């Protein structure tokens, strides 16, 4: 595990329908993340937060697209710099649209080393594009974008994007996926472990299979963790909550086994909304899950 970490916050909520998730990075930091990571022996560099444009162009099918593109371009540059210095980029959102920038940067950096795989833990598929979306919210498009099936503007920053191979992509904990979106995911060939399959197989089996798929002939894995994957009773502070999600223990098992694989190259933690939270319960959980993904074990 890389012992040098760059923590990059992104104060972004223009990709979502509800405001407040822009304060997610502050909530996760307030939960003690930086000191706890230092206590684990990491060399932690807090790179501050990326700020979005306050105004920008929009459309019915890609709401606030100018702000989304601008933020992702800035994040792409920051993650690229982090990787060039040999550090682990840890990105704190912010809504999930920011994953387009972080994943694009990591994929580009490892393009000549086999590329990367992606494990996407989320209640939603995020596999829409401007033609399939029902809402126009761009936090529902980044997974498809980084694989070349979504809006190219989310990942094209003046050079050819390094798209992720769908054979190395896994979606876990989905339980609110649009019919068109589900059809597109099936056609693309992405591996999906919906919540009912986790119930049937158990999280250890699911995450081990996900690691095998994402790391097959790749340099390693990017983890994109949307806190709405966790059941709202445990993580109430998120804007698109869906009931009957992952338990806290299932969530920790997933990230602990990923840490033990020594395949993790980079990570996003997104969609923590402190406005909707209860005494920073969700921010604290997000911080603890990050620590477990980086090697801490919850007994």
Predicted regions, residues:
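Solvent-exposed alpha-helices and their adjacent loops that cap or buttress functional pockets
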Residues: 1, 110-113, 136, 158-165, ...
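Catalytic cores of soluble, metal-dependent hydrolases
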Residues: 2-12, 18-90, 102, 108-113, ...
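Active-site metal-binding loops of divalent metal-dependent hydrolases
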Residues: 12, 95-96, 123, 174-175, ...
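Active-site histidine-anchored catalytic micro-motif
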Residues: 88-157, 261
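Short, structured patches in soluble enzyme cores that scaffold and shape functional sites
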Residues: 120-123, 147, 168, 173-176, ...
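Internal, well-ordered alpha-helical segments in soluble enzyme and binding-protein domains
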Residues: 123, 127, 139-142, 165, ...
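Active-site environment of divalent metal-dependent phosphoester hydrolases
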Residues: 128, 177-179, 274-276
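Phosphate/diphosphate-binding glycine-rich loops and adjacent basic-rich segments that engage nucleotide
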Residues: 155-182
């Amino acid at each position: 595990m890389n012992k040098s970490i760059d923590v990059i916050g992104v104060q972004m909520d223009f990709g979502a329908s509800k405001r407040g998730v822009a304060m997610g990075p502050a909530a996760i930091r307030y939960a003690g993340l930086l000191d706890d990571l230092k206590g684990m022996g990491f060399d932690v560099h807090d790179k501050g937060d990326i700020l979005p444009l306050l105004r920008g162009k929009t459309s019915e099918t890609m709401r606030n697209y100018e702000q989304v593109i601008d933020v992702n371009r800035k994040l792409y540059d920051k993650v690229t710099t982090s990787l060039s210095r040999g550090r682990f980029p840890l990105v704190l959102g912010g809504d999930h649209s920011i994953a387009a920038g972080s994943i694009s940067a990591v994929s580009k950096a490892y393009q000549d080393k086999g590329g990367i795989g992606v494990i996407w833990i989320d209640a939603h598929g995020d596999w829409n594009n401007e033609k399939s979306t029902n809402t126009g919210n761009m936090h529902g498009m980044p997974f498809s974008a980084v694989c070349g099936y979504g809006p190219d503007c989310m990942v094209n920053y003046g050079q050819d994007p390094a798209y992720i191979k769908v054979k190395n992509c896994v979606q876990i904990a989905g339980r609110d996926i649009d019919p068109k979106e589900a059809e597109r995911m099936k056609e693309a060939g992405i591996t999906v472990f919906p919540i009912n399959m986790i119930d049937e197989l158990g999280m250890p089996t699911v995450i081990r299979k996900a690691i095998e798929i994402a790391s097959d002939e790749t340099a390693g894995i990017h983890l994109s963790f949307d806190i709405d994957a966790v059941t709202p009773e445990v993580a109430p502070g998120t804007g698109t909550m869906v009931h009957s999600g992952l338990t806290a223990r299932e969530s920790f098992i997933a990230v602990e086994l990923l840490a033990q694989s020594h395949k993790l190259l980079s990570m996003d933690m997104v969609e923590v909304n402190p406005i909707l939270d209860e005494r920073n319960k969700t921010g604290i959980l997000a911080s603890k899950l990050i620590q477990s993904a980086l090697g801490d074990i919850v007994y």
